[in-house]
Amino acid sequence: MQVSVETTQGLGRRVTITIAADSIETAVKSELVNVAKKVRIDGFRKGKVPMNIVAQRYGASVRQDVLGDLMSRNFIDAIIKEKINPAGAPTYVPGEYKLGEDFTYSVEFEVYPEVELQGLEAIEVEKPIVEVTDADVDGMLDTLRKQQATWKEKDGAVEAEDRVTIDFTGSVDGEEFEGGKASDFVLAMGQGRMIPGFEDGIKGHKAGEEFTIDVTFPEEYHAENLKGKAAKFAINLKKVEERELPELTEEFIKRFGVEDGSVEGLRAEVRKNMERELKSAIRNRVKSQAIEGLVKANDIDVPAALIDSEIDVLRRQAAQRFGGNEKQALELPRELFEEQAKRRVVVGLLLGEVIRTNELKADEERVKGLIEEMASAYEDPKEVIEFYSKNKELMDNMRNVALEEQAVEAVLAKAKVTEKETTFNELMNQQA
C-alpha cells in the first residue's frame, strides 16, 4: 500500500492510496473460495462447484465487494499510520480500475483542528456571593400565595397588581387598525403584556369609567404598519379586581408537600429549594463566564462536518419541542441553527482539549453527588437514584456532565476570579 497526504484547504485533507494488484487478486481469490463453500448451482453438490464456474458467475460482484472492503480497510490503516484524526464521514473518490493493475483511489475529509490552549490566565470571572435571607423566603412565600390567590371585585381605583376587564378600540390617525379591538379583555396588571403606557393609562380609573389613553408603539413592534406610531385607545373599564391571598393555613401548606402543615416546615422547605436553585444559578453563572472567556481567547477553525452534524441535532430537538417529525426537522432552515451549532462545536473542542491536557476523568463521587442533587427535587429521591444507577446511558450522560464541570474548574484554576456580593433576586433575574 502506497499512501500520500495533502492539504486541500484549511482543515481539508486528501489521502491518496494505491493498492497493489497482487493484494487485490489474493483477496478476490480468498473471497471466491468462501463463496464456493456456500453457493448452490444445479448439477453440483454444495461446496463442490468448480472455481472457474464460481469465478465466472460471481467474480464481478465479488471483485466489487472486495475493492470496497479494501478501500475502507486501507484508509483506516493509512490514517492510523499517518496519525490523522478525521472529523466527520470521509468521501471516497475511486480511480479507474483495470484488471491485473494496481488500483489508486483517494479519500477526502476534514480533520480536527490542532488546539493549543492560550489566554487562560487573562480570563476574568465574577463569582456571585449570595445567601438566602429570611426576606427572600418571605418573598417566595408571597409568590406562592399569589399563585394560589383568588380574585375579588373591588370599587376602588386600579392599582399596580389588580386585574381589570376592559373593552378597547385602538386607532392611528383616527383610523382603527387590525388587531386593535377587543371586548371583555381580561388584563392582569404589572405583567408587561401590553405596549408601554397602556397599563399606566388605566391605573387610577374605576369600574364604569370610559376614557382614552395615548401611547406610542415601540420601534421593534412586530406589526410593520404600527412601528413607532402614535395611537389612541378608547377604553371602557368594566370591572376591577384585587387579589385575595390565601392564609398560611395547615391545609394550604400541605399542598406543597409539608406533611406537618406548619409554617416553620413550609419555610424550611422553601429555603431548601431556594438554596438548591441558588447553587445551580451560581454554578451556571460562573461556568458561562469561564466558557465565554475560553472561546474569546482561543480562535479555532471548525470542521464543517461537525457543524453540519450539530445542526441536525438542533433541528431534531426543535422539531420534537414543537411536535414535528424527522422530515419536518430536516426542512428547517440551517441558518436558524448555524451560529449556535458552531459555538457548541467550538466549546466542545476547547473543553475536550482542557480534559486531554489535564488528563481528567469523571470523578465518580461527583457523579453520585450530581445525581443526588438532581433527585432531591423529586418526591421520591431514592427511586430516582436507583433508576439512574440501573441505566447505563443516563449514567454516562451524568459522567459527561461531571467531566465538563471538572474541565470548567480547570479553566477557573488559571483564570482571574473575583467575588461580588449580590442578592438572590438580582442573580435569578440575570438568569431569566
Curated annotation (Swiss-Prot):
One Pfam family recorded for the sequence: Trigger_C
Catalyses which reaction(s): [protein]-peptidylproline (omega=180) = [protein]-peptidylproline (omega=0)
InterPro entries: PPIase_dom_sf (IPR046357), PPIase_FKBP_dom (IPR001179), Trig_fac (IPR005215), Trigger_fac_C (IPR008880), Trigger_fac_C_sf (IPR037041), Trigger_fac_ribosome-bd_bac (IPR008881), Trigger_fac_ribosome-bd_sf (IPR036611), Trigger_fact/SurA_dom_sf (IPR027304)
PROSITE patterns assigned: FKBP_PPIASE (PS50059)
Domain remarks: Consists of 3 domains; the N-terminus binds the ribosome, the middle domain has PPIase activity, while the C-terminus has intrinsic chaperone activity on its own.
Reported function: Involved in protein export. Acts as a chaperone by maintaining the newly synthesized protein in an open conformation. Functions as a peptidyl-prolyl cis-trans isomerase.
Protein name: Trigger factor
Annotated organism of origin: Escherichia coli O6:H1 (strain CFT073 / ATCC 700928 / UPEC)
